[in-house]
Every structure is written in structure tokens, then in C-alpha cells.
């Protein structure tokens, strides 16, 4: 038997369900009820207009808002961290709240650190992260209106971004690294419990996307 539940529907005091402790507890619930399959909606980024997991600016990157704040290495949420209504999701305020925290943490990383090598050694991932930086710079304008030399990825473009927009680049590298790190831990735990995770893909990838 199986059950469909997107992580955003899990309980969380930070405004939106995530792939942290509540997700591990849900795996325990599935094991206890002899449920073998956990089906998810796509885990990619969503547009800031529709918030649909099927409409994404990237088919490869993870949704940073699914990152559990309590499981970020060397970060402890303070008692002053805002808590949200547990019965509904205010996407815009949640995104603003989490992005502020992610940005502050990300500025302390060194993108030359070997821990980021695997992520950045993948040219497709690197190109999609570059797209997100440019998307932020252009204020969500469609890529066809960008400067010509920004419309097509190249290693030279990435190097320019690394020099001129390092703060934004750090933000997106950190959030993607942390998403995939936490997601790998959850998948490993589910495998140990013999719970199969059945995923999905963003079948309506936006025109205004890295793809």
C-alpha cells in the first residue's frame, strides 16, 4: 500500500512542512502502519507567483523552502525566530522569512570549499544556479529580455557571476547544497525502514526557467 503526502503538508512551526524531523517521524508512521510507498509531488523550486510544485524555474534544483532550519549544520534557531500558524501556509511571508535566514548563513561559506565540489562540478547544476542568480538580478523578468550575453550559459558567464555577484551566488549554492544534503539523509532513512519514495517531475517547467 502507499500514501501520497507532500512535505509541505507536514507539521512545522516555521510556516511550511519540510524534510526535517517531521518527515522522519512520518517515515516511522509509514513503517508502523506497514505502508510501503510514500508518494511525493515534485520537490523542485516553485514560481513565486503560483507556488505550484508542477510549475518550476528549474527541473533540476531543489526547493530551498523544504530545508529544515533545525538541521542546518552549525545553525541553531533562536527563541526570537518567528513561528507561523501551523494550520495554514502563507507562502510569501514564509519565503521572505526563510530567505532572510538562508542569506545570512550563506554569507559565511567559502564556495571554494571542497564540500561544494560535487554540486558545482555538475555543469547542468552550475548552469541552473547561475540562472537563479541572474533571475534575482533581473527582478524575475523573462530571460528573453536579459542582456544577450546573459541568455546562454557558459563557464565564462559563471566566472563573471562568481566575481560580480558573489553574495547571490553563495546564497544559491548554499541552499542547493543544504537541500540535497538533507534530502539524502531522509532518503537513506526511508531506505533503512524499507519505505520506497515515489517521486514526480515538474511537467509544466516555466518558459522563464533555466531549462
Named regions from a protein language model:
Residues 1-211:
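Acidic/aromatic-lined carbohydrate-recognition and catalytic surfaces
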Amino acid at each position: 500500500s502507499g500514501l501520497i503526502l507532500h512535505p509541505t503538508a507536514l507539521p512545522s512551526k516555521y510556516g511550511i512542512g519540510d524534510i526535517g524531523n517531521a518527515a522522519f517521524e512520518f517515515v516511522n508512521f509509514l513503517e508502523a502502519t506497514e505502508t510501503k510507498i510514500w508518494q511525493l509531488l515534485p520537490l523542485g523550486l516553485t514560481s513565486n507567483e503560483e507556488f505550484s510544485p508542477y510549475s518550476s524555474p528549474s527541473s533540476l534544483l531543489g526547493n530551498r523552502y523544504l530545508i529544515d532550519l533545525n538541521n542546518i549544520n552549525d545553525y541553531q534557531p533562536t527563541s526570537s525566530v518567528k513561528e507561523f500558524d501551523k494550520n495554514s501556509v502563507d507562502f510569501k511571508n514564509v519565503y521572505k522569512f526563510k530567505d532572510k535566514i538562508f542569506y545570512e548563513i550563506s554569507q559565511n561559506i567559502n564556495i571554494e570549499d571542497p564540500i561544494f565540489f560535487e554540486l558545482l562540478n555538475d555543469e547542468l547544476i552550475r548552469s541552473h544556479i547561475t540562472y537563479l542568480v541572474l533571475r534575482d538580478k533581473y527582478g524575475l523578468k523573462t530571460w528573453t529580455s536579459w542582456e544577450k550575453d546573459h541568455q546562454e550559459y557558459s563557464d565564462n558567464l559563471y566566472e563573471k557571476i562568481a566575481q560580480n555577484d558573489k553574495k547571490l551566488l553563495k546564497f544559491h549554492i548554499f541552499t542547493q547544497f543544504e537541500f540535497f544534503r538533507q534530502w539524502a539523509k531522509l532518503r537513506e532513512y526511508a531506505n533503512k525502514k524499507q519505505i520506497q519514495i515515489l517521486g514526480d517531475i515538474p511537467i509544466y517547467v516555466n518558459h522563464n526557467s533555466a531549462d
